[in-house]
């Protein structure tokens, strides 16, 4: 019992320092400063919020010194065994006792600004940033969260005045909203980034947010026409500034810490002609849902001008009503007729980042007939006035005629998006002959091609090849006579080629080329001749043997011409491209050393020719 009493006394004494400014030095000689959040005696841990590191400050004896850091950490949990020194630099501010006015059962809700604390620390400043919105007997709107046990995800607005001595870590700040006058439960608001009083908000965060939910009516103080109306309070960045605008005093706004809002004359007339606060009860049922309520059509009268709302508000309205986003044009402005079922469009204020308008989906490509059908449901707009708000950017005015001109007609014949393949486009040469990628080019003579420009295509066979019928059509005597003639013509030109006696030509006996009954046929007969002669066969013999075996080798061949025809020579008909090569002459126009030398420079072979 004595130990329990001692532990309870020590824990209560430690809890009394919660909210104090603590200077903590670790065993690594690094000093930290932050607000004491909790002390866990069981785990020997200390939690600080809004912690900043000041480095070693010259205390480290060995090794490099750790420089201070300007980064402020929201929460750090320290291990008690690694803490070298702990000092309390400032005690938590003394909370004034609760006023006795809250004990009156006739009071449903009270609202008064909290006094500014004297301490300059961040959490104590945050504790006095928002007015006290607490109500009597803990109404259902209060989000009761145990700050001693868990880290809150957002700052609840209902129990700002009932924290006691333990301020919360400022993880997220809540947006503008005030409880309705009839004591409705406070809703789950979107986590808008709103810094505490006295902390500046970056400009990059002020523009894209645009305050999606600003439709909750202010508390019924009745001090001015703005607070008595049911119009939502809107931030000053949503309204265009004009020369005839009027300034609202900060005292007339529900939050005294806010900057004065500049409103144009059209908005002021709207506020003065707005309905009475009795509409607040009519707006209560939509507030009970988690969806974003429809803001503009129920509250604005029909004879007023719609000011420029942000694009996020329009999106929230369309998300709650289930209307499509693709039917609306990009951005429009102008007076709007009585509320309809079509989505509202808006114009951005000058200075708002253009990334908001880029997020909107673009309209699909449709025909003019479809535009005429969808144009009947568009919001009727008149041309924008030029003498009023001149700093509003008019990006596009919506009308069915304008959309018809901007959308191309898809039924017209259009050129292909991608260019045609290079093989399908024959190139016209200056000499009148076309050479599509050198496919099907048949060189003849000295580079003047005879090809008809046909592209090389792969033949598709539908039946098996008939060898017997093709053998009957093949006339070997005609081919051999043609070869003999070419040999005689070329014999006079080259005296260095080896001489072959005509008497030696008929040494090879005529044998059938293919015999099904024999295992060996005439295809392998040259090995017997080589064994008998013990030397390489002569060129004329080899050429005749190859002709009998394979026929005219390069007659229907399109490729690169082979090694100079059929002789075992050094002729190279490189790049014949369909040239006719006979023997070792490389073909006519196909390269090689025969007559018709070099079809467009596609072969420079030299072959050993016989007489």
Swiss-Prot record:
Q: What's the protein here called?
A: Protein decapping 5
Highest taxon, organism lineage: Eukaryota
Q: Quote the biased-composition stretches of kind Basic residues, using this chain's numbering.
A: 441-453
Which keywords does the record carry?
A: Cytoplasm, mRNA processing, Repressor, Translation regulation
Pfam families from the xrefs? FDF (PF09532), LSM14 (PF12701)
Q: Can you say where in the cell this protein is located?
A: Cytoplasm, P-body
Q: InterPro entries annotated for this entry?
A: DFDF, FDF_dom, FFD_box, Lsm14-like_N, LSM_dom_sf, Sm, TFG_box
Q: Where is the composition biased (Low complexity)?
A: 264-281
């Amino acid at each position: 019992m004595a130990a329990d009493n001692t532990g309870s006394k020590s824990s209560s004494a430690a809890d009394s320092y919660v909210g104090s400014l603590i200077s903590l030095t670790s065993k690594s000689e690094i000093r930290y400063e932050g607000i004491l959040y909790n002390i866990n005696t069981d785990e020997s841990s200390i939690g600080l919020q809004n912690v900043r590191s000041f480095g070693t400050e010259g205390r480290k004896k060995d090794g490099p010194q750790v420089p201070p850091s300007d980064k402020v950490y929201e929460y750090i949990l320290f291990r008690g065994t690694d803490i070298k020194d702990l000092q309390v630099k400032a005690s938590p501010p003394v909370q004034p006792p609760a006023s006795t006015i809250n004990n009156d059962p006739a009071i449903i809700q009270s609202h008064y600004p909290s006094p500014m604390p004297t301490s300059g620390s961040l959490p104590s400043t945050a504790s006095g940033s928002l007015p006290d919105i607490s109500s009597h007997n803990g109404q259902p709107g209060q989000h009761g969260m145990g700050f001693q046990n868990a880290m809150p995800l957002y700052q609840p607005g209902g129990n700002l005045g009932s924290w006691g001595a333990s301020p919360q870590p400022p993880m997220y700040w809540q947006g503008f909203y005030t409880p309705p006058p009839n004591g409705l439960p406070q809703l789950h608001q979107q986590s808008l980034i709103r810094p505490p009083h006295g902390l500046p908000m970056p400009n990059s965060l002020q523009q894209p947010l645009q305050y999606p939910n600003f439709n909750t009516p202010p508390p019924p103080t009745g001090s001015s026409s703005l607070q008595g109306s049911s119009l939502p309070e809107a931030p000053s960045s949503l309204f265009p500034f004009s020369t005839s605008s009027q300034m609202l005093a900060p005292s007339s706004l529900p939050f005294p810490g806010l900057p004065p809002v500049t409103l144009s004359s059209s908005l002021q007339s709207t506020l003065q002609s707005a309905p009475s606060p009795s509409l607040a009860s009519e707006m209560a049922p939509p507030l009970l849902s988690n969806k974003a309520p429809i803001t503009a059509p129920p509250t604005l009268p029909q004879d007023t001008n719609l000011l420029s709302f942000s694009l996020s508000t329009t999106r929230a309205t369309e998300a709650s009503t289930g209307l499509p986003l693709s039917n609306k044009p990009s951005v429009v402005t102008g007076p709007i007729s009585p509320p309809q079922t079509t989505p509202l469009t808006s114009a951005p204020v000058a200075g708002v980042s253009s990334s908001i308008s880029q997020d909107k989906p673009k309209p699909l490509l449709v025909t003019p007939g479809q535009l005429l059908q969808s144009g009947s449901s568009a919001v009727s707009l008149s041309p924008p006035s030029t003498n009023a708000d001149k700093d509003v950017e008019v990006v596009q005015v919506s009308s069915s005629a304008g959309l018809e001109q901007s959308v191309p007609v898809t039924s017209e014949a259009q050129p292909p998006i991608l260019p045609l393949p290079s093989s399908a486009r024959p190139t016209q040469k200056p000499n009148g002959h076309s050479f599509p990628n050198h496919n099907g080019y048949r060189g003849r003579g000295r580079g003047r091609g005879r090809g008809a420009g046909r592209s090389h295509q792969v033949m598709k066979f539908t039946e098996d090849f008939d060898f017997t019928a093709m053998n009957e059509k093949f006339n070997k005597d005609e081919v051999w006579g043609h070869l003999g003639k070419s040999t005689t013509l070329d014999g006079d030109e080259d005296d260095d080629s080896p001489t072959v006696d005509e008497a030696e030509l008929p040494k090879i006996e005529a044998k059938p080329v293919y015999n099904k009954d024999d295992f060996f046929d005439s295809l392998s007969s040259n090995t017997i001749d080589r064994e008998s002669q013990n030397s390489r066969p002569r060129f004329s013999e080899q050429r005749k043997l190859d002709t009998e075996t394979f026929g005219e080798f390069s007659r229907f061949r399109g490729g690169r011409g082979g090694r100079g025809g059929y002789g075992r020579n050094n002729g190279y008909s490189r790049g014949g491209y369909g040239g006719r090569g006979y023997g070792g002459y490389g073909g006519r126009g196909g390269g090689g050393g025969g007559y018709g030398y070099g079809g467009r420079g596609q072969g420079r072979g030299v072959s050993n020719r016989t007489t």
